[in-house]
Amino acid sequence: MPYQLENRPPDLRESMYFPEIIRGIGTITKHFLKNLFFSRDANPDILARKRGGFGHSDNVTLQYPEERAPYAPAYRGLHRLVPREDGKPRCVACYMCATICPAQCIYIEAAEYPDDPVEKYPAKFVIDELRCIVCGFCVEACPKDAIRMDSGEHTPPSYERSAQIWDEKRLLRGPPVSYQYDPWLRRGSPSIPPDKLEEMRARAKPFPTVATDEASQTPGFSVRALAAEAKDRAQAARK
Amino acid sequence: MNRFFGMLLVIAATLAGLVLLSAGFYLAAGWLGWGFNALTGWISGSPGVSRAAVYYGASVANVVTLLLVVLMISSSLLTVAERKWSALIQNRIGANRIKVFGSALGGIPFLAADALKMLTKERIETTGRTRVLYELAPMLAFAPVFALFAIIPVGQGIELNQIPGLAGAAAAGAVEQIALQVSRTDTGLLYLFAIASLQVYGTALAGWASNNKLALLGGVRASSQMISYEVSLGLSLVGTMIAYRTLRLEEMVVAQGTPVLGPVPALGLLLQPIGFLIFFASAFAETKRAPFDLPEGESEIVGYFVEYSGMKFGLLFLAEFAEIVVLAGVITAVFLGGWHPILFEGWLRQNLTPFWFAAVGAGAFIAKMIVMMWLQLTIRWLLPRFRFDQIQKLCWKLLLPAALVNVFVTGGALLLDPSGQLLAWIGILTIVVIAVLTAAVGRAPAPAAGHGAAHAAAGH
């Protein structure tokens, strides 16, 4: 919180320097001794770290390669094309994401399944990760929940720019998702074998109304697990 | 809590190690002194005890143990300590990426990495430099510091036959006492002032011989700053000379062990608190470190050493840390009671052999030195640097008059009461006044974070 300091010349005590310096040494020594004698809380979540009180150092350092701060549930990571249970993309090549993308980094070529007269699929689905501004509009625009940024990963670095052009083969990954309202589940599809269809219907669930449910499906990342951990921590602290 | 007990253990082990180290130093001094005596006796063909031979032999041993071990090791460790301690002050971890068997060992392995880097770096030499002076400057910066440590009385004198293994060597009083002090000169503090004033040549020449405007500016700033502060440095110690009636540092230390007010010993800090503050500030300015680091300034002039690279820069850099060690040694000897372990001193003196009491004393001296080094590094991380005019104003308008007043007050008090009790009371009064001034709240505290404060913020 910035506040205005009165601009006045130093009084006698301040112009003697020594009293103020001794006070400063006291403040610094407090930090020094606390950090010398007490260890860091190992919790990598800096905001949740115990510090400052007696028995804990004031240290805020995160030893990066070994310790990593967990990302927030809303973290927008690398895109993925969400697969169906049968391994095909949920995407129906409607161009919504390519249309809303302010950086125009999504390129889609639509195609039709040879045995299914209704459904389309993306023959090509290319995202130029170098142009992507990570705004997340594509995820918002998608009517089929077919593109997500829930991977919790950064775009991996590469030596060639061409390696940053991600096509549908690399984008299609992560856990499959099925919803009860999915049209291919309700009406069936010739491209899906009947027993597979039954399995997909069995695993389909209602569309989520709570935002955190989606994030909880991120591989390697779970809001529920985090919440449980925080609860455990709080309970341990109360004891 | 594990770290808490570990740290207590480390501190206890360090103290015990210092005592054992000092015992080793005494052994080295005693044995080398006696060996030197035997050697000269064998060469000259006249067996017997020679005062000078024992003294010279002990001095040679002390050069090795005190100058090369205590001074050099601690000043090189300070380069690591500066990083590690500043990290502790600023709530960081500090240098810890070099690991030996999985342990960072408090960052100490960085010492080896630094030395390797300095020694293997490319030497870049400017064409316009004045060759002789350019090469001479790092040596001139380093040598006086080294010479200064020669008169620091790290350990008290004990008789030669009190050292283990030398019981039958020479009767007490037959030869010079063995002390952990390279040179016991009558000139004492005068030698200190003389050598300390040589320090300015290293920096001034480094700036001048580099043929670089910025380096020259750094050198000129260094000269004006160091020459100014030499005046208050000298005057601040005049009070202690009057109080202890001697110039010799070892006699000052002995005098500080005598009780003056009941059981309270006549520490320099007690008799001369103002002298201590002035000496500390002036000597801090002599070390050219923050807040007095005007000779170097990365944002304006780079510094007097801008044209130096590799180990030549390393020597200039190490000289500053060696100055810290020497300053810590002088303050310990003159103001903090030197080798007197203050606490439990009578009990220790009664229950230990003279040899081990001396070793404990020398360990206490080094421990006090470490505290003073820590204090200097703390102040370096506490304060922003002064402006140049503020530096001169602080010296000529504050420190110098205060030092002069201190000299007259000390002289007057001792004239009225030669036992020093009046001086001690004046010292206690001064300390109380400083403590009250420190505790009193000066500036108004920051306004409470509320709506009013938000309105005061710029741009609101």
UniProtKB/Swiss-Prot annotation, chain A:
Family: Belongs to the complex I 23 kDa subunit family.
UniProt binding sites for [4Fe-4S] cluster 1: C91, C94, C97, C142
Cellular component aspect of the GO annotation: plasma membrane
Entry-linked InterPro entries: 4Fe4S_Fe-S-bd, 4Fe4S_Fe_S_CS, NADH_quinone_OxRdtase_chainI
GO molecular function, one term: iron ion binding
Keywords for the protein's UniProt record, in alphabetical order: 4Fe-4S, Cell inner membrane, Cell membrane, Iron, Iron-sulfur, Membrane, Metal-binding, NAD, Quinone, Repeat, Translocase, Ubiquinone
One Pfam short name: Fer4
Superkingdom assignment: Bacteria
Function (record text): NDH-1 shuttles electrons from NADH, via FMN and iron-sulfur (Fe-S) centers, to quinones in the respiratory chain. The immediate electron acceptor for the enzyme in this species is believed to be ubiquinone. Couples the redox reaction to proton translocation (for every two electrons transferred, four hydrogen ions are translocated across the cytoplasmic membrane), and thus conserves the redox energy in a proton gradient.
Name of the protein this chain belongs to: NADH-quinone oxidoreductase subunit I 1
Residue intervals of the 4Fe-4S ferredoxin-type domain: 81-111, 123-152
Known cofactor(s): [4Fe-4S] cluster
Catalytic activity line of the entry: a quinone + NADH + 5 H(+)(in) = a quinol + NAD(+) + 4 H(+)(out)
EC numbers for this chain: 7.1.1.-
Bilayer disposition of the protein: Peripheral membrane protein
Compartments where found: Cell inner membrane
Underlying gene: nuoI1
Free-text remark on how the cofactor is bound: Binds 2 [4Fe-4S] clusters per subunit.
Binding of [4Fe-4S] cluster 2, residues: C101, C132, C135, C138
Subunit text: NDH-1 is composed of 14 different subunits. Subunits NuoA, H, J, K, L, M, N constitute the membrane sector of the complex.
